[in-house]
């Protein structure tokens, strides 16, 4: 059994490191460039993601943790850190082009957000690999570089069988749909799918289109300042995320997929 106190202390320090919190809490914090911060958002998101990770490990939900859209790798590193002290039988899969966004689909392009090449990972794949290694977390994660339409179909042959946590940070409509179509069937009952971009209209459309097409009725829940405890530590619209728990498949020819 892992030492809970030691695990909690380690993960708390890891959150501070990934989001620059150790510097922000200084009496006179240094000015950090955005490239010096590995994570996006704030550590409250990681605390709330940990609630879901704790549950799937405690309940024995089968599968690895997957992040589709990893950017600089902050969240994936936290998931790997969590597994390093809680369940080393699992691993993290982190997918990204590491070279920026693809040409946006028509639905996303109408909004003017995320043009081709935006959100390129500073330093590219090598930088993320180096950060995983510096933190001693590279053994718990596999980075999968490339466009989703090329890499997602290869995940079974790479060794991904089942998923317990699926974090979708794919940004644009087409990439979110590609992620869900390829990976949601691998999400185990009792596992969670988490969306970082639901605040954008094209992301909401992708989520609702996918749920409708597949008859998914699982209750959608928010992590933000107005959420039920303990999911209330993600303050502000830019830090919230949406998630739901996949239900077991109903015994019916017209069953939902959860």
List the predicted regions and their residue ranges.
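N-terminal auxiliary segments of SAM/dcSAM-dependent transferases
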Residues: 1-11
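Conserved alpha-helix/loop element of class I SAM-dependent methyltransferases that forms part
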Residues: 47-60
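S-adenosylmethionine/decaboxylated-SAM
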Residues: 14-43, 59-258
